[in-house]
Amino acid sequence: MHEQYQPLEIETQAQNYWKEHQSFLVRELPDKEKFYCLSMFPYPSGKLHMGHVRNYTIGDVISRYHRMQGRNVLQPMGWDAFGMPAENAAMKNNVAPAAWTYDNIAYMKSQLDSLGLAIDWTREVTTCKPDYYRWEQWLFTRLFEKGVIYRKNGTVNWDPVDQTVLANEQVIDGRGWRSGALIEKREIPMYYFKITAYAEELLESLDNLPGWPEQVKTMQRNWIGKSRGMEIAFPYDQASIGHAGQLKVFTTRPDTLMGATYVAVAAEHPLATQAAQNDPQLQAFIDECKRGGVAEADIATQEKKGLATSLFVEHPLTGDKLPVWVANYVLMNYGEGAVMAVPGHDERDFEFANKYGLPIRQVIARVEGENDFEPTVWKEWYGAKDESVRTVNSGKYDDLGYQAAFDAIGADLEAKGLGQARTQFRLRDWGISRQRYWGCPIPIIHCDACGDVPVPAEQLPVVLPEDVVPDGAGSPLAKMPEFYECSCPKCGQPAKRETDTMDTFVESSWYFARYACPQFEGGMLDKKAADYWLPVDQYIGGIEHAILHLLYARFFHKLMRDEGLVGSDEPFRNLLTQGMVVADTYYRTTANGGKDWFNPADVEVERDAKAKVVGARLKSDGQPVEIGGTEKMSKSKNNGVDPQSMIDQYGADTCRLFMMFASPPDMSLEWSDAGVEGANRFLRRVWRLAHAHVSAGLPGALDGASLSDAQKQVRRAIHLAIRQASQDVGQHHKFNTAIAAVMTLMNVLEKAPSQDAQDRALLQEGLETVVLLLAPITPHICHVLWEQLGHAEAVIDARWPVVDESALVQDTLQLVVQVNGKLRGHIDVAASASREDVEAAARANENVLRFTEGLSIRKVIVVPGKLVNIVAN
C-alpha cells in the first residue's frame, strides 16, 4: 500500500476491477427485492457539465447504498439524442447531426466512466437509433388507429425567409433568430396526442405520489388546470351579422354574466374574418395579431390590444346588444376562440375596457366594509368569488353568493338552451409535429385515395437518413424524393411519406421503460421484465422538468398501460429534484454597454475576514473586474468549471465527495475551490490513517466484552456514525450530514490509542466503518482500502454496516450544570442514576457551590441525560 493517496492509480484499479467482474450487470431476479434508480438521461451536447456530475453522483450514491442493503439494483444510462442543437451544430460545422451526436456520445460516455458510476451499460439506449425509435413509431400507429393521435390544423411561427417553422424560443422580438425575418402565424396540419382524454386521471393520480415534492405536484395541477364553469351561447345579432348563429364562450364566472359589456374573439375567429372583409384597418390588425407569438407566456405579458368590429351578439339573459371586438389576448386554440368580457370583475377585461372606453358594470359588492368600487382603479376584491361578496345590479339574481348565483344563472341558461355546465382543463392536446430533420420520422403515408395511412408494422422502422447536413431552410426530408416517394400500403398507388418528425419529448417519455428490456425485439416492451423493474423507485432530475417531461412521461406510462405493455399506473414512485450548481461571476462592461464575462479560474480574488469576496482582478493584466454575484454555471456567464479538469487534478472521488458534502441534494450547490481542496484533504487523512494501521499488521478479533471505558467511547462513536449515516442516506438523502458524521468519527479514530491488541482491533472496526459509510460516495478509494483492510470480497458486494445498540449504551453520562441558565461546570453520573442522585451531584459540584454562595436555591431543573439547571436568588 502506497504511503501517499494517489487517486489516478486507485481509480484506474477500481474501474478495471468493476469492468472485469461486470460488477454492475443486472438481471431480473424474481426472488430478490429490486430497486430501480434513474437519473434523467443527458442530451449529448459534447461534454459533461457540473450539473450532470451532480445529478449522476446523487443517483449513484443512492444506487450503491441500496445495493449494500442487499437489493437487486438497476442504474441504467442512455442518450436523449434527437433535437435542435445537433442541427445547429451541424450547420455551424458542416457535419451531419448523426456524426456529431455519436462523437459526443463516445466522449461523454468516457467521462461518465471516469466518475466511477455503477451503470449497467448493457442497457444503454440511444434515442436516435432505429432499434429504439421503431417502437415509438409502432405505438404511434396503434394510437393513430385508436384516435388517441389525430391530425388537425395548428398555429405555428412561420419564418418566410428560411421557409420553416420556429419554436417559440426561436422568435426574438417578433423576428426569426437566424434570418431576422418578421415571423408570421400560419395554420399547418399537425399531429396531436389526445392528452386531454387523460387529464382527469393525470390530475387525480397525483394524490398517489407521496414520494414527489409537493411543489412539483402543484405545478402539474396548475398546468392541467381543472376548472368548473359553463359554456354560454350568445345568439348572433342577425341585423349586423347577416345570419343566425351563436358565439360560444367558456367561463368559470357565470355569476358575473349580468356584468358582461362586450365579447372578444381571436384574430382567426370566423366573425373576425367576416368583419374584416370591408375593413382594411381591422384586416391589418388581424395580420399583426397573426404575426405575434403563439406561446401562452408571450400573450400574458404582451400589451393588450383590440379593435371593434361592426358586429354584435345578444346577451343570453337580457337580449342587450354586446359589441364584438377582436383582441390579441384571445387564443383560437383555447375553448372556441372567444371570451365574454366582464370588465368590472376581471382584471384583464378591466384594463382593456379602460383603454378603449368600454362600459364597466359592477355586479358584485362586498358584504362588509366600504363598497369602494371605482371603475378606474382595479382592486383585488373585484375578482373575489368567496363569502366576502354578493351579487348586485343583477335583477332577480341580486344578493346571492358565488355558488348560488352560479346555480341560478346556470339553471336559467340551461332552460333557454343557451348554457350548460362544463368542466374544462387548461391542458391542451400535445402537438408533436416538427418541421425538422433530426427527429423520429412520423410513420404516416399520405395517399390521394386512402388519406392518411399508418405505416404497417412489418415496414417499420421508417429510418431517418443519417448522412444529411441541414442548411436551416426548411426540412431537408421534404426535399428528398428518395425519402418521401413511396406506395400506399392500402391501395398500392404512388403516395407520399410524411416528412415531419416527432417532438423530442416523445423519446424521453418512455425511455425509462425500455431500459427494462433494451434488447427485446418482440415488441416495444417485454412485459415480464417491465413489470419486474417498473415503476422507477427513485427518479432524479432538475425542477425545470416539473411540467412537460414529467407530465408527458406519466401520460405515456398510462398509454403503455392501456396497450397492455405495463401493469403499473405511474412511472416514478419517488422523485428528487436536485438544485443547481452555482458559481461566482466576474465581468467588465464593454464600450457598447455589453459585458465581457471572465472565468473564475482567470480571476484573483481578495476576501474579507469572513471569506466574502470584496475585490477581484484579472490574472492576465492585473486590472480590476466587477463582481457579478453567484449564478447558475453557464456558458453565457463563463462561470462553468470543467469537470474533466477537476477529475484530472484531484480524482473523481474528491469531486464526488465535494458535490455531496457542500449542500443537501435539493438545494443549490455553490462551487468552491477551497471546498474541493478540503474534500481532497479529508480523503488524504483517511488514506494516511489506514496506511499507518495496515503497515503495523492487521489485528485479531475484537473482544467486545472486555473493553475499557475509553475503548467503549470509541466504539460508541463508531456506532453513532453508523446510526446517523443510515438515517441520512437511507431515509432523507442528506448526504452532507452523513459525511459530517464520518468526519466526526475520523476525529475520534485519529486520536484513539493503538498500543494494545484491543485498541488496534477497535481501530480496524472504525476504519471498516469509515470505508463502508463512504463506499457509495467515494467508491474508488473505498474499493482499495477495503481490500487493504484484509477483505477477500470487494466492497461493492459488502453489506451496509448495522448499528450495535449495545455499543450506544453508556455506563456514565456527562451532564452540563448551569446556575441561573449559565454554564458553570460538568458532572459525571451513572447512566442509571436517579433524579435525586443527579441533583445531589450537581449541588456538590465546587463551581456550583461557588456561584450559589449566599443565595437561596429556589428550584433544580433536571433534563435527563442532558443538563441540570439550578435556579437561585
From Swiss-Prot:
Question: What Gene3D superfamilies does its record include?
Answer: 2.20.28.290, 3.10.20.590, HUPs, Isoleucyl-tRNA Synthetase, Domain 1, Valyl/Leucyl/Isoleucyl-tRNA synthetase, editing domain
Per the record, a Pfam family?
tRNA-synt_1g
A single BP term in Gene Ontology:
leucyl-tRNA aminoacylation
Subcellular location(s) per record? Cytoplasm
- UniProt EC number: 6.1.1.4
Leader peptide range in chain numbering: none
Q: Identify the residues that bind ATP.
A: 635
Name of the top EC class for this enzyme: ligase
Which reactions does this protein catalyse?
tRNA(Leu) + L-leucine + ATP = L-leucyl-tRNA(Leu) + AMP + diphosphate
CDD domains per record: Anticodon_Ia_Leu_BEm (cd07958), LeuRS_core (cd00812)
* GO cellular component term, pick one: cytosol
Q: A GO molecular-function term, please?
A: ATP binding
Chain span(s) of sequence motif 'HIGH' region? 42-52
What are the alphabetically sorted keywords of the record? Aminoacyl-tRNA synthetase, ATP-binding, Cytoplasm, Ligase, Nucleotide-binding, Protein biosynthesis
Disordered: annotated span = 624-643
Renumbered ranges of motif 'KMSKS' region: 632-636
Protein family (similarity comment)? Belongs to the class-I aminoacyl-tRNA synthetase family.
Which NCBIfam families does this one have?
Answer: leuS_bact (TIGR00396)
Specify the protein name: Leucine--tRNA ligase
Which species does the entry assign this protein to?
Pseudomonas paraeruginosa (strain DSM 24068 / PA7)
Protein encoded by which gene: leuS
